[in-house]
Amino acid sequence: MIKQKIINLLQKKINYEKLKIYNESKKHNITHNKNSHFKILIVSNYFINIDIIDRHRKIYSWLSIFFFKYKIKSLSIYAYTTLEWKNKKCKSFFNSPLCKNKPNS
């Protein structure tokens, strides 16, 4: 539900070549909010001539409502231009470890 809302909002704000959103909440020791930790990969030429900090600021500003309304605790952002993504050597960085406080299942 929240994932789709994030997708819908980003579709209105930016033209992108690639968008992936991962819900990483299950990797954390949280029982009351199954939508608390997200990771976003977005590739768009919108980011040309925008430094990494400003890319993140822009995306956070677009998604700020979700932090309060849905109590999102963590958002990791990977924002690239098309050329940066094409030249990226390792694209498997999306394998996040389990949270330190997450008990083994």
UniProtKB/Swiss-Prot annotation:
It comes from the Bacteria. InterPro entries: BolA, BolA-like_sf, BolA/IbaG_stress_morph_reg. Belongs to the BolA/IbaG family. PANTHER family: BOLA TRANSCRIPTION REGULATOR, BOLA-LIKE PROTEIN 1. This is Uncharacterized protein bbp_418.
